[in-house]
Amino acid sequence: MTGSSDFPVKGLRGRLTPNAPLGPRAWFRVGGPADWLFVPEDQDDLALFLREKPATMPVTVLGACSNVIIRDGGIAGTVIRLARGFADITVQGNSLIVGAAALDITVAEHAAAAGLAGLEFLAGIPGSIGGAVRMNAGAYGSDINAVFEWADILTAEGELRRLSHDELGFAYRHSELPEGSVVIRASLRGTPDNADAIRSRIADIRASREASQPVRARTGGSTFRNPDGHKAWQLIDEAGCRGLQIGDAQVSEKHCNFLLNLGQASSADLETLGETVREKVLAQSGVDLHWEIKRIGRKSEGEQTV
């Protein structure tokens, strides 16, 4: 283990970093440091940490950091980031057994190579499988709920459990994963099909995303959930928020449900902009938008509660 001897859990083999910068890891490129950043070597290393950590230590799991605003004051306790030891992808029959750190697009490509259809939608979702399972990520007419078979998790106490589809209780952008648990791997089901046809559909999804979303900007994916019977982007546009800017935080002119960091935005700028959009949409349409992007961590000193 690399890191400080002050850390309360001994015997870890992974990388442990005190006061670790998180902003450079986030798609928005904003956010304060983690008190501790732990990158476990493997499942056993992570289980040891979860078993032995003090009960009072806050723990936050971060994946690809594509759907999160890390606040400017950083994150208390320990941030867990799963890396290469959790990114394996194997094909078993018509299923893919996927490590939680595997990127969604990589899973889609592996499924295509195996001639398994139904996972193409993952090519349109920035992030990793652990986060996709946790929030029932979806795009282009499908979601994790439609292809999920089971997930192996480590509980907050470090116990390995396998959860079935029914136990996850999927709903729109939601699952019933136990509090404090960490997804280790998941089994996703495909349907046999022609590999070239699958690759063609993936290419279409990637082209559509490139054309309609600010994929090359500092952004975090869809900001708000789609309310029942509405499209969030349309409500935002009708409220006059396209291009709205606070500091270097801007509502994308290309797709209104994306926030952008134009260069020097803070997390506070992004969060304040999002709340301003919510207020304007509520005043215009009476619809209360709910955040899809997770906002985590401490606000900076003196920052007002949003």
Curated annotation (Swiss-Prot):
A Gene Ontology biological process term: regulation of cell shape
Matches recorded under SUPFAM superfamilies: FAD-binding/transporter-associated domain-like (SSF56176), Uridine diphospho-N-Acetylenolpyruvylglucosamine reductase, MurB, C-terminal domain (SSF56194)
InterPro entries for this protein: FAD-bd_PCMH, FAD-bd_PCMH-like_sf, FAD-bd_PCMH_sub1, FAD-bd_PCMH_sub2, MurB, MurB_C, MurB_C_sf, Oxid_FAD_bind_N
Residues in FAD-binding PCMH-type domain copies: 29-193
Active site per database record: 173, 222, 292
Family: Belongs to the MurB family.
Alphabetical UniProt keywords: Cell cycle, Cell division, Cell shape, Cell wall biogenesis/degradation, Cytoplasm, FAD, Flavoprotein, NADP, Oxidoreductase, Peptidoglycan synthesis
NCBIfam families associated with the record: murB (TIGR00179), PRK13905.1 (NF010480)
Role this protein plays: Cell wall formation.
Main subcellular location: cytoplasm
Protein name from the UniProt record: UDP-N-acetylenolpyruvoylglucosamine reductase
